[in-house]
Swiss-Prot record:
InterPro entries: Ig-like_fold (IPR013783), PKAT (IPR045219), PKAT_KLD (IPR046846), PKD/Chitinase_dom (IPR022409), PKD_dom (IPR000601), PKD_dom_sf (IPR035986)
Compartment list: Cell membrane; Melanosome membrane; Early endosome membrane
Main location: membrane
Natural source organism: Rattus norvegicus (Rat)
Glycosylation sites: N93, N134, N200, N249, N275, N296, N300, N306, N312, N461, N469
Residue intervals annotated with topology Cytoplasmic: 522-572
Annotated segments matching region Disordered: 321-359
Entry protein name: Transmembrane glycoprotein NMB
SUPFAM superfamilies in the cross-refs: PKD domain
Transmembrane stretches, start-end: 501-521
Physiological role: Could be a melanogenic enzyme.
């Protein structure tokens, strides 16, 4: 009896060994448990159930944190970055992209091999071989063309064979995507892309997980594993940008009175699912101006009162979808309980559009699929309206005279006026004539009266044409104006000419005074007889004779001019 029990235990253990050894995709990729009805309702075209067995011999499974991950790649670890264009409207496509980030100084070349980058320093000593992994040449490359048992390793984890490569284009990475209890396997290079349709997916956040393997001889080893959350919604994903001309900060949702606000609706539709759908916009600005309905995604609105207003926008469109059951069973169309409130993401007001049982799903599958379902998108914001600076104008520009002119410096006075609130600061930006390249920026606090009249003095370096930008601001607004200013050149010779003119005038005046003095002196001079000056005459005669002898060598030609006066004494 004991031997019989031992045999039975042995048989049970032997029968259980294959079950324990055989791994499934859900054991490798994720441990989320999905109910059977979710698996049936969230079927993805081209995807397989994660209940399939995983070929652990060809694709080994490593637990997170094992030391083997460190040696899975030459020169460091490979990181995988997973992104998606979530959120996605039900019925549209959502795309996932995986990009591999190699260790420093490594990249993928045109043939799919991993090589070292040139002129890139690495912590490791680079060998003479430029390849990190050379998959183009070698014995493994011949297996792609071999259909015998030697190429049996060219298959996915579930045993399906690899697709035939086109030409010499090879893919050396295996990507396995997993979500909603299903998986999709694909070959790729350093990047892989997968798109799925969300027509049958459950609304709400979901998880996408990806594991990446690389070629390693006749097997594959994991190099990276990553997951990301994506969202499926039955609301139209929208975002509204609000802009106002003189608003200082549009992100705080505080705007100015008596200036139009520009509203622009952005619909997140990367798969262009709504391209052929008519979209209507219902605007309610909360200031008792009524409801505006338009087919344009932009609109301007001006608030004329200060205060806080609730802005509401509703976007509506009709999209293709499954038709509702024509005769829903009374047992399935139960009314909601009073304690449960409808979700704000509910886009279809009719409860018959929501599948409530397996039977209604079957009727929907066999019914005509040319129905359209209304989808809605909502945006709400609290807008605050305050007073602000509405307008700035330059009314006068004047040159400031400088006592000592400098050729490289000119001063200009600007008279600036504004409308609206009183500014607390003024900024001046001096730029080139195109108003593109700023040369000088000066900001300073200002104290302005109720008339908002401001005088600003600014210096300019050299002559030429400048673009001057004046900005007046307070806590909520920022108004500006610009003008082109021409600065004339300074005449460096004008001071010298002024000094020379003054000196010449003074010289002429001195000569005139001297001449008048001489004339007056001669006119009023007292007469003195010659006889009383005998001594002086004798002395004068001796001096005259001396001068005559001194001039004789230089003026011989003039001796005959006065022959009768030679050797004769002077007589007056």
């Amino acid at each position: 009896m004991e031997s019989l029990c031992g045999v039975l235990v042995f048989l049970l253990l032997a029968a259980g060994l294959p079950l324990q050894a055989a791994k499934r995709f859900r054991d490798v990729l994720g441990h989320e448990q999905y109910p059977d009805h979710m698996r049936e309702n969230n079927q993805l075209r081209g995807w397989s159930s994660d209940e399939n067995e995983w070929d652990e011999q060809l694709y080994p499974v490593w637990r997170r944190g094992e030391g083997r991950w460190k040696d899975s790649w030459e020169g460091g670890r490979v990181q995988a970055a997973l992104t998606s264009d979530s959120p996605a409207l039900v019925g549209s496509n959502i795309t996932f992209v995986v990009n591999l980030v190699f260790p420093r100084c490594q990249k993928e070349d045109a043939n799919g091999n991993i090589v070292y980058e040139r002129n890139c320093r690495s912590d490791l000593e680079l060998a003479s071989d430029p390849y990190v992994y050379n998959w183009t040449t070698g014995a493994d490359d011949e297996d792609w063309e071999d259909s015998t048992s030697q190429g049996q390793h060219l298959r996915f984890p579930d045993g399906k064979p690899f697709p035939r490569p086109h030409g010499r284009k090879k893919w050396n990475f295996v990507y396995v995507f997993h979500t909603l209890g299903q998986y999709f396997q694909k070959l790729g290079r350093c990047s892989a892309r997968v798109s799925i349709n969300t027509v049958n997916l459950t609304v709400g956040p979901q998880v996408m997980e990806v594991i990446v393997f690389r070629r390693h001889g006749r097997a594959y080893i994991p190099i990276s594993k990553v997951k990301d959350v994506y969202v499926i919604t039955d609301q139209i994903p929208i975002f509204v940008t609000m802009y106002q001309k003189n608003d200082r900060n549009s992100s705080d949702e505080t705007f100015l009175r008596d200036l139009p606000i520009f509203f622009d609706v952005l619909i997140h539709d990367p798969s262009h699912f709504l391209n052929y759908s008519a979209i209507s916009y219902k605007w309610n600005f909360g200031d008792n101006t009524g409801l505006f309905v338009s087919n344009n995604h932009t609109l301007n609105h001006t608030y004329v009162l200060n205060g806080t207003f609730n802005f509401n926008l509703t976007v509506q469109t009709a999209v293709p979808g499954p038709c509702p059951s024509p005769t829903p069973s009374p047992s399935s169309s139960t009314s909601p309980s009073p304690a449960s409130s409808p979700s704000p993401t509910l886009s279809t007001p009719s409860p018959s559009l929501m599948p409530t049982g397996h039977k209604s799903m079957e009727l929907s599958d066999i019914s005509n699929e040319n129905c359209r379902i209304n989808r809605y998108g909502y945006f709400r914001a609290t807008i605050t309206i305050v007073d602000g600076i509405l307008e700035v104008n330059i009314i006068q520009v004047a040159d400031v005279p400088i006592p000592t002119p400098q050729p490289d410096n000119s001063l200009m006075d600007f008279i600036v006026t504004c409308k609206g609130a009183t500014p607390t600061e003024a900024c001046t930006i001096i730029s080139d004539p195109t108003c593109q390249i700023a040369q000088n920026r000066v900001c300073s606090p200002v104290a302005v009266d109720e008339l908002c009249l401001l005088s600003v003095r600014r210096a300019f370096n050299g002559s030429g044409t400048y673009c001057v930008n004046f900005t007046l601001g307070d806590d909520a607004s920022l108004a500006l104006t610009s003008a082109l200013i021409s600065i004339p050149g300074k005449d460096l010779g004008s001071p010298l000419r002024t000094v020379n003119g003054v000196l010449i005038s003074i010289g002429c005046l001195a000569m005139f005074v001297t001449m008048v003095t001489i004339l007056l002196y001669k006119k009023h001079k007292t007469y003195k007889p010659i006889g009383n000056c005998t001594r002086n005459v004798v002395k004068g005669k001796g001096l005259s004779v001396f001068l005559s002898h001194a001039k004789a060598p230089f003026s011989r030609g003039d001796r005959e001019k006065d022959p009768l006066l030679q050797d004769k004494p002077w007589m007056l």
